[in-house]
Every structure is written in C-alpha cells, then in structure tokens.
Amino acid sequence: MLSGSRAAMAPPIGNERDTTGTTRRSLLAGVAALGALGAAGCSRVATASTTEGGDLLERLKAAGVVRLGIAGEIPFGYIDKNGELTGEAPELARVIFKRLGVDRVQPVPSEFGSLIPGLKSQVFDVVAAGMYVNPDRCEQVIFADPDYQMLDAFIVRKGNPKGLHDYKDVVEKKAKFATGTGYAEIQYAVEAGYKESDILIVPDQVAGLNAVEAGRVDVFAGTALTTREVVKKSSKAESTKAFAPLVKGKPHVDGGAFAFRPTETRLRDAFNVELHKLKKSGELFRILQPFGFTKAEMTDLTAKELCAGGTG
C-alpha cells in the first residue's frame, strides 16, 4: 500500500543532485532549519479541536502563519539555492492562505512517506507537496480538489536504446526498473506485470537520474513534469514522451492536491472555494507555469472522483 504523491524514503544512491546544483541532502538540511523554527513558533496552532468541521482556520488566522509539510521535491515544494521556500504548492498556498486571512507560510520538512503521519500527528497543518489523490490516502486524510493533473514518463539513457515507452515495454524487454519510494509508479509497474521485489527503490527523481546515468538501471519512472525537468542538465539521459499508465486495464490520470486532517473540513472547504476561483480566472496556471506546468496539466478533476478510484 502506497504511503506517499508519488512518496517513505530509501537510502540515497550516490551523490544526489538537484536541478539547481545543490545536493538534496543539503537542501533538506536547509529545510530542516526553517522547519524547526516554524515548529517552535507555531507549536500551539495545531492543537486538537472539538468544533464540528474544525477550527484550524480561525487559529491559523490568529497565529498569522500556516505550517506546510513539504518533501524537498522539485518542482512541488522545496528550498531553492537562495534558501527560499518555493515550488508549485508553496506558491499556491501563499496566494490562497493570504485570501483566507493567513499572511505567512512556514515550511516544515519531511520525508515524502512521512507527510501523512506528520499531518495526522500535527507536526504541520497542511501537506503542500503535490500529493497524488488516491483511495488509500483518502482513508487517512481529506484532500482539496486537485490543482494539477499528471501523466507518467521515464528517464532513460540518451536515444532510449531499449525502446521503453510504457510499463508494458519495461516488462517485455526485462529492463532494470527503478522508481521513488512510495511512488504511485510502483503500483503501475506491478500492475503491468513487473515483479515488485525486482524494483530498485530510490529516494526521488534525482537519485533516479543518477541510477540511469550510472547504468544501474535502464529506466526510472516518475511524473512527466519531474522527469522532463530533472534531465534538462543531463548529457547522458532523456525523458520519454508522457503516457497514461494502465490501472485495471484503463488509462489512468493522476491529480495532485493539498491534504488536510479529516477533522478540518471547514479549512479544506474554504481552501477549495479559493482554489476554484483561481482556476476560473486563469491565475492558477500563471502561478504554476514557472515550475514547468503546462495547460495540459490543468484539470477539472475532483478529489471525490479520485478518492473513488476514478481517473476521468
């Protein structure tokens, strides 16, 4: 059962680069420092509430800050080379929470697989990491409607020598396959017939790129967006054309969204109202575009249909 969007983390392979040239290890160290300050400064915000639908929004307004659980994953939520919090989810959170009367956002670092446990244990207030909405996760948290939709793609060596374009190719050509810890792509590969115990699990797309470049694997599977972004500075690897994985024999489209504790329906609903205003005005696309999102990633998918296992 998947715990993470796309992810619990495994030990790194080699030196993990990110697309800014900073190692992921140092990136997470920077996030940790900021997160520690945020946890100290907001320790009383996330106390339990007996109010129906929760009163977290009122408490966040009073505190003036919301703590965002992020996983240090480009482009979803990370600390940039200047030490600033950015990514599609934090930038969207800034806009929406400002509209809701909360002036500041504060990053709290987490391994991807620890985001839901951290949310449930009130380490942070909201998960802002581009987390995929799926039935398993919907049993543990509640989601806003997706702010983006996403297909899959592979990282392969230049020229794609094995001709790998989907999970069926990976199985039929007996390719050495890797993906990220807890990524939904594990399920997609297994559904296509790949033996789960043969999958190399790495922390993220940067480690996946390293593994492909070093020849440890033939292919790494991730989102179309993250794979095309991470290979931009690589002379040895490329991203394949985006494709929809098959789930129960049907093409599946994922959607990423903010996650909230199940008791905080009032906050989730207020967030959704502002999110839909941004969608209607086109401002959502303007916020996400600098992070590599295209109009093809804009979506009308709902959390309700994804929680029910639908994909459009």
Name the predicted role of every residue range.
Residues 59, 157-176:
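Flexible hinge/capping segments at coil-to-helix
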Residues 131-139, 188-191, 218-252:
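A ligand-binding cleft/hinge motif common to bilobed small-molecule-binding domains
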Residues 1-22, 30-40:
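N-terminal secretory signal peptides
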Residues 43, 90-99, 160, 168, ...:
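Extended ligand-binding regions for polar small-molecule ligands
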Residues 43-50:
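Bacterial lipoprotein signal-peptidase II cleavage site
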Residues 106-117, 200-210, 214:
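Short helix-initiation/N-cap motifs at beta->coil->alpha
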Residues 50-129, 139:
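Extracytoplasmic small-molecule ligand-binding "clamshell" domains
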Residues 149-155, 234-272, 294-312:
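Periplasmic-binding protein-like
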